[in-house]
Amino acid sequence: MNEFKLQSDFSLEGDQPKAVDELCESLNGGNSHQTLLGVTGSGKTFTMANVIQRLQRPTLVIAHNKTLAAQLCGEFKEFFPENAVEYFVSYYDYYQPEAYIPQTDTYIEKDASINDEIDKLRHSATSALFERRDVIIVASVSCIYGLGSPEEYREQVLSLRCGMEKDRDEILKGLVDIQYSRNDVNFTRGTFRVRGDVIEVFPASYTETAVRIELFGDEIERITEIDTLTGEILGERNHVAIFPASHFVTRRSKLEKAIESIQEELHEQLEYLKRQGKAVEAKRLEQRTNYDLEMLQEMGFCQGIENYSRHLIGRPAGSRPYCLIDYFPDDYLMVVDESHMTIPQIRGMYAGDMSRKQNLVDHGFRLPSALDNRPLKFQEFEKMINQNIYVSATPGPYEKEHSERIVEQIIRPTGLVDPETEVRPVKGQIDDLYSEINKRTDRNERVLVTTLTKKMAEDLTDYLREMGIRVRYMHSEIDTLERMEIIRDLRLGKFDVLVGINLLREGLDLPEVSLVAILDADKEGYLRDERSLIQTMGRAARNVNGRVIMYGDAITDSMRRAIDETNRRREKQIEFNARHNITPQTVQKKVHDVIEATRSAEDETEAATPENIQEMSAKERKELIAKLQEEMKQAAKELEFEKAAELRDLIMELKTAQ
């Protein structure tokens, strides 16, 4: 049996050994919920890696967005290079869900652009769970969305061995049954090709290798792994398990029953709509569903097959859907990273999905069973937890209430202590801030400034720029990739001060920042509550000169609690350093580029900006105008009128420059 083997140049330091011991003791004692309260920069991921190695259990790590999941996946891959570390997030680069807007009688068809690489990683994740136990899957909240039945998925695996008696047509039929398609010309994932007695299969979970099956009569003579590009043999195999090309795969016998069940539901719903006087809706539903039924009958698949998943799996109405968690064995471990963000996100998924789908059902676009293709309700998610570790610097009320044990990780391996916090009056705050910024820039350090309003952020940025400070403003309209580029430029010293409203999102791991200034700190509410203040203050905790200045004329309860908690941690850290003769050191961290797996389709073509329009040739401008006009029409068609207007303005600018 494969075991988790942790490989690292680090050893457990500070509070890490105690945290690992206490978490393992709690888990081995049978507790379902425990929390790792680890301060920023204390090495929480390394602690979790040590817990996983000690427990030797398949582990699901849930993060609250794709970017954070990709970062965690990269870190776990470094810690466990010999084990299966997988990545499971939504495979859509672009996703426009099916929707109906009654007010304008507008039906928006589902439109999506699937990232083939991420789809491959999803298949790799589910197949790994059936092949081994040393598996860590890092997932976004996509893991609570509907998937096909794990039993069906497992039973439909095509298992082939050397010496097995199986004729060619039987193997080909088996491949077609699990959603592989024959393509002798374009050999891609999820396809197979045939040349005489040689069958080559490109499994859904592979990237650059395929499986070649050589027959002698009705017997499998040889199985080899080949390079898909060159056809070079990479290795001999005695056995190969080919997993289905779709997570929604059903045997023919079950498919026939599902079609009957869909027809029955269609008949009932048509009667109901007619009684309600909805003749148009009834006709629409009949046409759409009958078309899908024909596709299922002939091809075994249809567009939007997930909306019939309840029938295909044979689940009763209202029952919870299968999801990634069902693919794990019973003794699995769950880790919820940044739980103060992730738990509320999981809690809110069901309601948003339900309101959109109910409109589709009410107006004859979908059968009521489509409502059962949904994310888990929060209560369903709770029931699926075996044993869970919540990881956060500021655990939310849910984690605090449910955890049988809260383990603190306050001491950082670097010896860094939480920053000193000072409250200063509002009067003269801008001049005071300017003076503090100059002190930092003289030492080649960086500054974060957080405000409460967009206008104040813009005005402050303009003022500091006029005063000769190299400053940037980060607002909510900037997408993830651009945010990460701004953060990278800050770390590289291309500018010194970053102003923003919500500077709590992922990626703000900045050892160069030695000052965090919080304006309007005494305005109680969102972004000025205790948890947000502690998170914001923590941004200065990776630099040995870290300091926090709050500007406010009063000290609110949230400020007091945040300052008291930070001071409590700081005292503990200083005492530990003195006892062990540790000198704090600023975190040394490479400036990484954005992880490629999370790049979205929009990043593949650089947008034209006023700066680079002047550099284009006439031919380049003409080609770009044609491309942007297509995008503008598409945006208008999808009711994205703001985007269409932006594209129109850009086209006009390009035409003017010609």
Swiss-Prot record:
Stored CDD domains: DEXHc_UvrB, SF2_C_UvrB
Subcellular location: Cytoplasm
Beta-hairpin (motif): residue ranges: 91-114
Domain of life: Bacteria
SUPFAM superfamilies in alphabetical order: C-terminal UvrC-binding domain of UvrB, P-loop containing nucleoside triphosphate hydrolases
GO biological-process terms attached to the record: nucleotide-excision repair; SOS response
Domain Helicase ATP-binding: 25-182
GO molecular function, one term: excinuclease ABC activity
Keywords assigned by UniProt, alphabetized: ATP-binding, Cytoplasm, DNA damage, DNA excision, DNA repair, Excision nuclease, Helicase, Hydrolase, Nucleotide-binding, SOS response
Domains: entry comment: The beta-hairpin motif is involved in DNA binding.
Family (UniProt): Belongs to the UvrB family.
Family annotation (NCBIfam families): PRK05298.1 (NF003673), uvrb (TIGR00631)
Oligomer and partners: Forms a heterotetramer with UvrA during the search for lesions. Interacts with UvrC in an incision complex.
Designated name of the protein: UvrABC system protein B
Organism: Natranaerobius thermophilus (strain ATCC BAA-1301 / DSM 18059 / JW/NM-WN-LF)
Highest classification ranks of the organism: Bacteria, Bacillati, Bacillota, Clostridia, Natranaerobiales
